[in-house]
Amino acid sequence: MNPQELKSILSHGLLSFPVTDFNAQGDFNPAGYIKRLEWLAPYGASALFAAGGTGEFFSLAASEYSQVIKTAVDTCATSVPILAGVGGSTRQAIEYAQEAERLGAKGLLLLPHYLTEASQDGVAAHVEAVCKSVNIGVVVYNRNVCRLNADLLEKLAERCPNLIGYKDGLGDIELMVSIRRRLGERFSYLGGLPTAEVYAAAYKALGVPVYSSAVFNFVPKTAMDFYNAIARDDHAAVAKLIDDFFLPYLDIRNRKAGYAVSIVKAGARIAGYDAGPVRTPLTDLTAEEYEMLAALMDKMGPQ
C-alpha cells in the first residue's frame, strides 16, 4: 500500500487503537491480542493503530514492540490496515519505524517525543528524519510537546512525500483551522483528543470528519453508531449518546491522570476481552470505578 492509498483510507470512516494484551505477570499475551483483533475487525473501522498511546507504546520493550506489530499485521492481513505507533528519540523512532515497515505495517503514527524540551524547528527535524527513514505513509501527532504549526507542516509536506496525515491532540481550534486551510487536501486530518467523540461534531465542522475512538475497544457498536450519527448530521442521536454514555464515561475517566488508558482496559475486561492490567506508571481503576463503568456499559446494550 503506497502512502497515497493509505491517505485515502484514513480520510473516511472511524479509526481505533486496540489496547495491548498483557497476562497476569504483565507480559505480552499474543493469544489475547489475536482474539481482540478478530473481535474488533468486523465492526468496520477503516484502520487500526497497533502499539499506539492506548496500546501502551511507551511501556513496551523493543522485542515486545516487534511481537505486537507482527501479531497485528498477521491477524488483520485480509481485514483492516494496521498502522504502527512509533516514538521516543529520533534514533529510537527510526528503529521502530523501520521495524514496523519490515513487519508489514501499512503506515506509522508518529507519537510525540518523550519529555525532552525542544524548539518546534527541532521537532520538525525529528519528524523529517523519521519520514525519510521509511517508504510507508506517516501520520504526525500534534500533542503535548509536539506543536507543529502550519508553516512547519507545509515545509515538511514539501520535503516528505510520505507524510500523509495530521492527527490533532491539542484542541487548539485556531491552530487546527490554520493548518486545515493552509494544507488543504495535502493531508488526511484526524481528530485525536482523548474521548474524541465529545469533539467530533465541532471537528467535522472544521473539515476534520475522521477521528480515532478509544471506546471502540469495548463498546464497538456504540462507537460505530455514534460515528454514523455524526456522519449523517443526526444531532439528536449524537446528543443522546453524549448525555447517556460519553459524559458519564468522562466523569470516571477524569478521576485520575492516566485513566484514559486504564478505563479502556477496564471496559475491555467487562466486555469479556480481558487485556490484563495496565503497566506502571499507569494505575488500574478502583473496584468502585470498575462497577460504575460496568453499569454504564450495560445501559448501552449488546454490542
Curated annotation (Swiss-Prot):
**Annotated pathway, please?**
Carbohydrate acid metabolism; D-glucarate degradation; 2,5-dioxopentanoate from D-glucarate: step 2/2
Under catalytic activity, the entry for this protein gives:
5-dehydro-4-deoxy-D-glucarate + H(+) = 2,5-dioxopentanoate + CO2 + H2O
Q: What are the protein's GO molecular function terms?
A: 4-hydroxy-tetrahydrodipicolinate synthase activity; 5-dehydro-4-deoxyglucarate dehydratase activity
Where would you find the membrane-spanning parts of this chain? none
Against HAMAP family, the record matches this protein to:
KDGDH
State whether keyword Lyase applies.
yes
For this UniProt record, the keywords arranged alphabetically read as follows: Lyase
The protein's name? Probable 5-dehydro-4-deoxyglucarate dehydratase
E.C. code: 4.2.1.41
Question: GO:BP terms for this protein?
Answer: D-glucarate catabolic process
Superkingdom of the source species: Bacteria
The UniProt family comment states: Belongs to the DapA family.
Q: What SUPFAM superfamilies does this protein's entry cite? A: Aldolase (SSF51569)
- Fetch the Pfam families from UniProt: DHDPS
Xref: InterPro entries: Aldolase_TIM, DapA-like, Dehydro-deoxyglucarate_dehyd
Q: Which SMART domains match?
A: DHDPS (SM01130)
